[in-house]
């Protein structure tokens, strides 16, 4: 006989699939003003992500996980084109490649792409990320409605955080 507590903790692959969202689409993940000099940690479609701007103002997005010990990169430092982990200072660039491991000379991690990166577009006051699957890593063009990008229209970004499944938010 199975107790209710054991039954409730079973893995549900369908629920996990639904929580990860519809893949191969651009999603607005943050307003542009939210990402400035310090790295910002967000969770979207069940994925933890770090966002930061480089020295030219371009936004980068990586999985929020240091390849060395799994610490959150969003708690680290913005070095311009890369972010440094707060734990041991591992430097990871916007492509997910480890640039430097300060504590280990000639570390085998250096020059290796160890962290998932996301294609980023910044348009209409929002930061969009491409959530592609393994079969579609290259993003489709991000084509927004003319009302959001043309100068003859006024627009503003309205943001609200809902603690719910993305499916309910899309419907409303």
Language-model regions: role of each:
Residues 60-74, 80-93:
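Local cysteine-cluster metal-coordination motifs and their immediate loop/turn environment
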């Amino acid at each position: 006989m199975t107790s209710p507590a054991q039954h409730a903790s079973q893995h549900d692959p369908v629920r996990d699939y639904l929580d990860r969202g519809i893949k191969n689409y651009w999603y607005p993940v943050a307003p542009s003003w939210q990402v400035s000099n310090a790295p910002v940690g967000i969770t979207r479609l069940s994925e933890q992500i770090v966002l930061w701007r480089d020295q030219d103002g371009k936004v980068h997005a990586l999985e929020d996980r240091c390849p060395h010990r799994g610490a959150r990169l969003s708690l680290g430092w913005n070095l311009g084109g890369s972010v440094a982990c707060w734990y041991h200072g591992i430097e990871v660039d916007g492509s997910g490649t480890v640039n430097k491991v300060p504590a280990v000379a000639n570390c085998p991690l250096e020059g290796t792409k160890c962290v998932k990166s996301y294609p980023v577009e910044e348009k209409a006051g929002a930061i969009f990320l491409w959530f592609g699957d393994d079969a579609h890593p290259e993003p489709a063009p991000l084509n927004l409605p003319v009302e959001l990008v043309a100068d003859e229209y006024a627009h503003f970004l309205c943001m609200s955080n809902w603690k719910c499944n993305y499916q309910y938010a899309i419907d409303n």
